């Protein structure tokens, strides 16, 4: 059978009521926490996936394709030097906890201080989180995750969109405003220049996120 999660369909094992076995995807629906995630994730037999949680509901999604993986890698290399100058650290996917029953695994993140081996990163330690948008994550990356990150008080949210068929690359850097919502701080398309002094100096053409 299949369980519908977020905007995709991920094959999972039959429910516990059919087999008599404990199935965390069924039994823990709506009550997931980091403690339960530490105990039951990853799900045995599942393909490699990202596990995120919104208000106790587990969201399972496949890992990114090569276009987004490369874009995230390039963002890491571009941000690492200026972020380190401020004492910050840049990371690929982390478990960023946004509440007692909320967490995300952003494609990249900048923390105010080194993680030093931590598995769960409090949202208060994140200066910036970034997502590379894919067709299956468009709603989550544009609406759901920014709303949760804003509520958690993360000052910056970066959205990256790349397409090789359209030769398109776009970066939108959002900053938390006075009313608790994100506002556009900087934005650029391939062929233009993204330039910002905050949260640290960046100046580059988004086309650099596309492999040549």
For each feature predicted by the language model, list its residue ranges.
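Gly/Pro/Ser/Thr-rich low-complexity, intrinsically disordered segments predominantly at protein N-termini
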Residues: 1-212
